[in-house]
A protein has these predicted regions:
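Hydrophobic side chains within alpha-helical segments
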Residues: 9-11, 45, 90-92
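Amphipathic coiled-coil/heptad-repeat helices and related helical stalk/stem segments
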Residues: 19-20, 58, 86-87
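A secondary-structure boundary/capping signal
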Residues: 6-7, 35-36, 105-106, 122-123
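Short, well-structured N-terminal submotif of metal-dependent ribonuclease cores
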Residues: 1-35
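Acidic, PIN/NYN-like endoribonuclease modules and their adjacent C-terminal/linker elements
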Residues: 88, 97, 101, 107-132
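Active-site neighborhoods of divalent-metal-dependent phosphate/nucleic-acid chemistry enzymes
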Residues: 67-102, 107
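PIN-domain endoribonuclease scaffold, especially VapC-family toxins
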Residues: 24-81
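Short, active-site-adjacent cap segments at secondary-structure transitions
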Residues: 10-11, 41, 109-111
């Protein structure tokens, strides 16, 4: 299964652990993680800024993710799909990566339920799907 993990899921995986960490581990072990430079840049910026992680550690995490994932250029997504334009590249990543699943904790993206035929699920829903 080809899976995009949104920035918020990756941040939770590395900053707070728990469910999102388990989802990331499952994605890496049994599925193909698909990311974009947009998502990787957000992860690095927020880990070092918002989560006050040392910059060297944040860079190591981004490097690790880049090595483990297939990194794609997001497809263009028309404005108006979601209110927050910074969410458009996340949807575009799922589309460009021909993904089977987009995992996010973002309520606005979750409201879409699917995008171009790609199911959009919460980390909990993803965890349950992976457990099947």
């Amino acid at each position: 299964m080809r899976v995009v993990l949104d920035t918020n899921v990756l941040l939770a995986a590395f900053a707070t652990h728990g469910l999102c960490e388990a989802v990331l581990e499952q994605a890496l072990a049994s599925h193909q993680l698909v990311l974009s430079e947009h998502i990787l840049d957000e992860v690095g910026r927020h880990l070092a800024g918002k989560f006050r992680m040392p910059a060297t550690r944040a860079r190591e995490i981004v490097r690790f993710l880049r090595e483990q994932a297939e990194v794609v250029e997001p497809a263009r997504v028309g404005p108006g799909t979601v209110k927050d334009s910074t969410d458009l590249p996340v949807l575009g990543t799922a589309s460009a990566g021909a993904c089977d699943l987009l995992v996010t904790g973002d309520a606005e993206i979750l409201r879409l339920r699917e995008f171009t035929g790609i199911p959009i699920v919460s980390p909990r829903e993803c965890y349950e799907r992976f457990a099947r």
